[in-house]
């Protein structure tokens, strides 16, 4: 049986990235909550250049 998690940076960013979060009201609430908690990463970011 195939595993459910097939990692892909593209789809990861498209569904959980910062710009996607900011595009909806609920997404902005997510960012707001994470800021309030003092999270180091507010949304999914791909390490690189």
Curated annotation (Swiss-Prot):
Gene3D superfamilies: 1.10.287.3980. The keyword Glycoprotein does not apply. GO terms for molecular function: structural constituent of ribosome. One of its GO terms (cellular component) is ribosome. It comes from the Bacteria. Pfam families: Ribosomal_L34. One of its GO terms (biological process) is translation. Keywords: Ribonucleoprotein, Ribosomal protein. NCBIfam families: rpmH_bact (TIGR01030). Belongs to the bacterial ribosomal protein bL34 family. This is Large ribosomal subunit protein bL34. It comes from Geobacter metallireducens (strain ATCC 53774 / DSM 7210 / GS-15).
